[in-house]
């Protein structure tokens, strides 16, 4: 769901089906690295290096270690495994290691959501103008750490096609609000939940 850094789709990249996960994460929209812990990244004081050959993984549903369902080879060491190889970064308080408790902020509404709601309304009304593109580009530019006017430093949205903008906006919301519990409401509003959730 995360685009490439140049704004193109990952699945348009030749050989994407056979890439190692670390390769899949390279040269992606910066929001990917803010959503999950990339391999080889220091997170909460530990360099994250997932291994699928670990013997045990923590199962929070039962509150104990269980045999790793992804176990392929018996491992001599077991550290920081996960069933999928993915660990969530977004919304995780890095201070949790102090006392294993966290007090994360509760998001009521983000400015990015306001901007994308505005753009979505303009797109659905087919009243696409400069303000529509600016709203979307402000969100995308923030992710790249630049001003929305610096269009040479991020893949600025320039199309004015209603159908293309609808697709871009939906992808943008998926990337921007990962792990923020808004996706289900987007799918319901767009009337595509049944199709998307029953693939």
Language-model segments: residues:
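Acidic/polar-rich alpha-helix caps and helix-coil junctions
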Residues: 1-199
